[in-house]
Amino acid sequence: MSDLKAIQTRSLEMAEYFVAFCKKHDLLCYLCGGGAIGALRNKGFIPWDDDLDFFMPRKDYEKLAELWPQFADESYFLSKSHKDYVDRNLFITIRDKETTCIKPYQKDLYLPHGLALDVLPLDYYPKNPTERKKQVRWALIYSLFCAQTIPEKHGALMKWGSTILLGMTPKSLRYRIWKKAEKEMTKYGPADSDGITELCSGPGYMKKKYPIQAFEDNIFLPFAGTQMPIPVGYDAYLSTAFGDYMTPPPADKQVPHHDALIVDMDKSYTEYKGEYGA
């Protein structure tokens, strides 16, 4: 079995467990990005895709963080940054502790370096343009102080400003700033909003505005021999996010997007301790 096929097989096992957990605890979830496109275009993985990501409405997302440590299988670890633990992500990841997938940006961290399933929250997009500008500013502050890393792919100005801001802020204060930013950016509800947005997916996706109705429920579609949920308004979501999502990209773009230092679907990351930075 090729590395990519092995990763897809293990990712699907994780996704099936995750979806079953959400069903059991009445939590709404849906495949997003390439997983949702794959469900529609390929009835499974996009052939070169190497992971599955999920969206959840914010209230379900926060509930997941409470319920998972109590009721989930111990082989699946929910990683979410908090005051005493920073994993350099802006969102929840579910890690399979029986596998190895060590990312360069986490190589020096002491955490479960298993294959990850990303879970991203959806938030309301305020109607008022001034409030929307405030929301984006708070989301950028959240991104910097939650990840606590310098963004490398969003231009020299952002890199320079982030370096100064992080450098000037004591570690003891960073958590307070990030929690304040999180509170401010997520304070909007359906009454004062006319859309849904992604605040934890990076600056590009922060600009997106989707119809509220697109994420009111999910529908299940065939996916690699099982059934996976996608947003009920998948066309409005995917068209806004990706344009002509049913047309595959050029051949030179059909490559996995994620890098890793060590990948092993048969051995736990604990067997590789000492071979990477942590």
Describe each model-derived feature in a short phrase.
Residues 2-25, 68-127, 147-243, 248-278:
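Conserved catalytic core of two-metal-ion nucleotidyltransferases
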Residues 19-52, 56, 61-62, 213, ...:
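Active-site nucleotide-donor binding segment shared across nucleotidyl transfer reactions
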Residues 43, 50, 85, 140, ...:
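Short, surface-exposed, charged/polar-biased interaction segments
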Residues 64-66:
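Conserved SAM-binding loop
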Residues 127, 140-141:
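N-terminal beta-rich core of secreted/periplasmic extracellular enzymes
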Residues 129-134:
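A short secondary-structure junction signal
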Residues 136-138:
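Short, His- and charge-rich active-site/binding loops that engage polyanionic ligands
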